Amino acid sequence: MDSFDPQQLGLSPARFAGTFGSGAASVSCSRLRQVQSVLTQSSKSQPDGILCILGIDSRYNEGCRELANYLLFGLYSQNATDFEKTGFSEEILDDVILLIKSDSVHLYCNPVNYRYLLPYVAHWRNLHFHCMTENEYEDEEAAEEFKISSFVDMVRDCSRIGIPYSSQGHLQIFDMFVVEKWPIVQAFALEGIGGDGFFTMKYELQDVSLSLWNVYSRMDPASLENMLSEDLAVFEHQWTSFFANFDTEIPFLLELSESQAGEPFRSYFGHGMLSSHITENSPHRQPFVLFGNHSTRDNLSAGSFNFPSEGHLVRNTGPAGSFAKHMVAQCVSPKGPLACSRTYFFGATHVPYLGDNEKLPRTTEQIRLLSQIYAAVIEAVLAGIACYAKTCSLAKAKEVAEHTLESGLVFTELVPFKADLRSKVTFHIHAVNNQGRIVPLNNEDSLSFVKTARMTVYDIPDLLGGGGGGCLGSVVFSESFLTSRILVKEKDGTITPETSYIILTAAIPRFCSWLVEDSEIKLSEKTLQATKGDDCCLGTLLTGGKGAYLYSNSPQSGPEEGSAYFFSGGLLFSHRHHGSIVIAKEHVDAFSFYDGDSTSVVAALLIHFRSSILPHLPVHFHGSSNFLMLALFPKSKIYQAFYSEVFSPWQQQDNSGLSLKVIQEDGLSAEQKRLHSNAQKLFSALSPPAQDWSSPKLLSGKLPELDRFLQHFAIGSIGQEPVMRAHLVGLLQQPEMSPAHEVESDKVVISIVTGLPGCHASKLCAFLITLHKEYGRWMVYRQIMDSSECFHAAHFQKYLSSALEAQQNRSARQSAYIRKKTRLLVVLQGYTDVIDVVQALQTHPDPNVRSYFTIGAVTVCVEPLSCYMEHRFLFPKCLDQCSQGVVSNVVFTSHTAEQKHPLLVQLQTLIRASNPTAAFILAENGIVTRNEDIELILSENSFSSPQMLRSRYLLFPGWYEGKFDAGSVFPLMVQICVWFDCPLEKTRFVSRCRAIQSSIKPSPFSGNIYHILGKVKFSDSEKTMEVCHNTLTNSLTIVPVLEGPTPPPNSRSSPQDNGQPECYLVFIGCSLKEDSLKDWLRQSAKQRPQRKALKTRGMLTQQEIKNIHVKRHLDPLPAGYFYNGTQFVNFFGDKTDFHPLMDQFMNDYVEEANREIERYNRELEQQEYRDLFEQKPKP
């Protein structure tokens, strides 16, 4: 399985829609860092880790489930039906334990849910899988013991553990004894496999729910996408229902009550609040619909709208009991941050042009002035939002909003009321978290919250002084918006913010009106009828039809869909709410037409109008640029009819002197390009196949600025680490502005090859250098071996400085040639995080070095047999070495002949989940066989590509300035270099290496030796041999060191110049001790003979006594003894098996043996012997 398909696994694809596309890994890692930040807060009692246990093992604790869903994008929000589709029980899929530490994560799972979890977690930094293989998992008893032992291992290094005890809105009193009753926690106390004691007695537990709730409440790209595709869709549906109420009641609109009109908002909010557990009651976060003069300050500030009025109708809420001229409405998401308010009108704000210049009726004039105030309020709120997004200052935003409002009230009729209106204006910006709770705007996390900007002009008087001079009511407008900020570092080192914002509720119509008076309705109908007559002021009807969209650059208006009728002398646009809009040629300066010379491009008729048309144009179409755009969508009937019936006649100049002028894209102004782009997005969204609300196309069509904002927000939401100015354009994915990256000829390209010990990286590098000298002169950097660190940044930086100095010391002509041809190969075999190598170059103190070298590509070598310590527990940094954004190529150095080998496939799936863009290369033992693979490894610009650069900024915030913390190595792998002089015994050394594998211990792996490498001499040869032993594969290679030019001396890597030993071995393993390694190595050398101890009679063996008897039994007998052939007989007839003088014989034997021992010991003492680790005496 090389890629993840949720449908193949039986999970609902809706959960994955858009989640694991571009940037999903960065959001996942960002969320993990947010959770880990709880562990790094300055507190004396901060926990060492956060424990999250799912399923039955935590008695289905909701707090743990909520944390898992936050980190895994709602994976455990699946319903029972989704889990049944997988074919596995919920208990198996819930079998997950997470321990989150400040720089690492431990994850227990089983082989079944491992593949479900992998796409979500593979890119986490320092991830440790505690998972059995499929075969091991078949033994249920062993599987249960493994889970308990894994749990014990996870928490071994902790003293205080945080528990996400409660879910949001369901705060429970933390009870550690309830935690003690969780099944897996109870199992901790089991003897033998448990942790030797009760969990709650061994560890200090604390509830971290409140801290995590703050984390969950922040907006990030994933929660934004979820809000746009789900919450905003439901939110917009309420407004659709709201408009449907009015459209249905048009014949009886005057009898509509506030209660009827506001029912969709009230039901939506009330039902949602029942399950939201939000107790705050703020008037800014409650829905309302108020007609006419009922929308007073007192009613808007009542704090509760649970009891709407049935008696306030459109008919009776105007001045002096007349019909209302407008209404104010607000819809609020009960469990989310969305809210917006609008002011809509009952009556027309314009009079259709019928060839005369009749004065506006009094009612229309009143509504027109009210709508002008509302238009100024809209511009003020939008200006305030723009100012706040740029400055993050409420005071400045308020100042700008109020100034914009005052500038908008320029009409002579409003002059007497300016001072009075100014005193009745309020402007607020509220920050709202993801649960719909208002939070302080100066909160340090408020940047990541949705905000609502609202302006209200309270209690507007009767502007024309009629009707007894009563109050018309209030005007309200608000929008929910989200800001994004990227800190940009300039060349001079200064930091400047780059901001962006998106108005989330912009798709809700900002302006709407319904015709309620009979005179207005009749006038609209009269206009339509007049166009059909011969004496129409617009001339002859050419064609007409539905499906046209009218655009204006006014902030109040969006695309208005209606019917367009084209005449020889102008056009008429009919809208269901606004009535008829007549645009005669006498009010037009020019007609322009743009269609991009393509049948797939929206055709745009640009109408540049004169100010004389303003009384005949709805207020929200009054734009600062005095133009309208009529969009005709390709393949529509009106589109085809325009070309066949209108295009040619309009191109001919008539009495008005106007003719249709066809323009190209360069003839469009910036504002016209923006509107046309918006129309094109809307056409794309509405084109078949039909899109649902959550589709990116439709979202982009409704919110045209969304794509641009999402690119910005993806970077801005990661953190507050600055971005280099030169990188910003590429990060925001603006390819038309991003120049293709080419490596400058005077730079030295660095090719980095890394991997775990035993991965054959050195062989790959030797192969590259030997066979590919045409790439130029090679410099090779290898890590120093006599260091406890796998990678020493200071040493690497020193090497780079030396390399630059060596190049600069050459002659100018030679330097130019060599500089162009020189490449640096960096070979690192160890538990090194590649990002540390990158940061070492980026943070080099010499700017000349930083500019002289550039990284071409990073390649990691993977030996499948050397990846797992046990089960599926990876060696430290194994997965981190394959990180997206840094590594371009992954070279598999074994099992390449059998490409379907289960181990190879399993690792490829794991690495592909971690790095979807890496190229996979098969190279047995480091030997690459394809030229295209070599090109990938030696690429000069792979590392610097825009995609890689963007991934680095997203996954490694702060990397460019060396501020990204790669985390510690766990389990701690020790690298100990042992120097010696004496040759080793080859046979003993080989046998001892082979025996290491059988002594490997399970977790916590203390004392395990995994790799041995170095240079030694054996007693059977004078040659220096290079040895390399891999414990897991039990492979040992011994090859002569190739003779060649000696590298420059280095005090660290060439100790023989200082009289130190010339042989060394590097031991790599867990918790190794140098003394133990020396003792092990001594057993591989020629053993020093031991002094022999003197013998005594009591030490003689039976065999020795027998030998003495055989040798001396025929010696002369003392008087009174004779030998009968089998026994010795004395004078009294006593018989014995030994010679009567046997005691003397034994004493003689002991004396003789001791003389030999003493001679041997004297000779031994005269021999010169040095311990393996003694230094040679100086000559």
From Swiss-Prot:
A Pfam cross-reference name: CobW_C_DAAF9
Database matches in CDD domains: shulin_C20orf194-like (cd22936)
Highest taxon of the lineage: Eukaryota
InterPro entries to which the protein is assigned, alphabetical: C20orf194-like, CobW_C_DAAF9, DAAF9_N
Leader peptide range in chain numbering: none
Record's subunit section: Interacts with ARL3.
Chain's role: May act as an effector for ARL3.
Name of protein: Dynein axonemal assembly factor 9
Source organism of the structure: Mus musculus (Mouse)
Name of the gene this protein is made from: Dnaaf9
